[in-house]
Amino acid sequence: MTVPNDDTWGPATSVGTTATMAAAARAIATRDGVINDPFAEPLVRAVGVNFLTRWAIGELVASDVDVEGSPWGLAQMPAAIAARTRYFDEFYADAAAAGIRQAVILASGLDTRAYRLDWPAGMTVFEIDQPAVVEFKTTALARLAAEPKADLRTVAVDLRDDWSTALATAGLDSSKPTAWIAEGLFGYLAPEAQDRLLDAVTALSTPGSRLGSEAVPDTADMDPHAARQRMRAATAKWRDHGFELDVDVISFAGERHDVGAYLQALGWTTVATPMAELLADQGLPAIARADDDRQTMNGVTYYTSTLGTGRQR
């Protein structure tokens, strides 16, 4: 278990640290020419978590801190994060080509798509995240003289609060199709909160809207103590280098609905792509297999969903 319901964070604490870790992985993938996120490394530097900064700029290498052969470590992350970055970049390109002119990035973290993608004229991008995260990124990118390539509207609200009203106040037109993404989010939501979010997205969407999501597996039958011990062992050297990240404390394990099936019941059509397939399709290295892949990024599945006319209310 879990993040307390009243917990808040910035990019250097709690759940926010995972966004900075993902940005560090994007910085490495950018340097390797796999993706192009020129803002990733500067943002990681600005956050100031020494371990992640050193990793992002190449002063710390995965072999220094990973447990050999572990499927959960820094070595696996740049390819996995690059694959999902490409996936959601292409999702937005396809949505824009289909005429959608509203994009919502849920739990946007250090995402810079509003600044780096070539959006069509008339595109509005909404970013939703914790107030401290929104303030940090907005300020850091302004200091870099970065300019958004769309009409960017930040919505500083916790997704556990009334974000739907805040989004509408920011100008979302729910009578028009919207392209939503939930990237690196569901594992940090309680199962019932995941359902509420999908219900809310559906309520705010008109037919033709699209949702790109990264889903984590049901782990109801997994021994939580054993899972914690595996994670602690895999990240032991991180702590030796001064970086403490208890993923099991900030994430939610246990029983949860299958995202694809849940969305289909709400009137969406879905196409699923498991992580292993996504990596293979993009010519990226596979993640080492574990005895139980549900605790690694091999357990992640990506969904592209489109809302039909027969949605459930």
From Swiss-Prot:
Keywords: Methyltransferase, S-adenosyl-L-methionine, Transferase
Pfam family, one: LCM
Region forming the signal peptide: none
Gene Ontology biological process: methylation
Enzyme Commission identifier(s): 2.1.1.-
Molecular function, one GO term: methyltransferase activity
TM region(s), chain numbering: none
Residues at which S-adenosyl-L-methionine binds: D129, D158, L159
Lineage: superkingdom: Bacteria
Class of enzymatic activity (EC top level): transferase
Record-linked InterPro entries: Ppm1/Ppm2/Tcmp, SAM-dependent_MTases_sf, SAM_mthyl_Trfase_ML2640-like
SUPFAM superfamilies on file: S-adenosyl-L-methionine-dependent methyltransferases (SSF53335)
Similarity remark: Belongs to the UPF0677 family.
Reported function: Exhibits S-adenosyl-L-methionine-dependent methyltransferase activity.
Official protein name in the record: Putative S-adenosyl-L-methionine-dependent methyltransferase MAV_4573
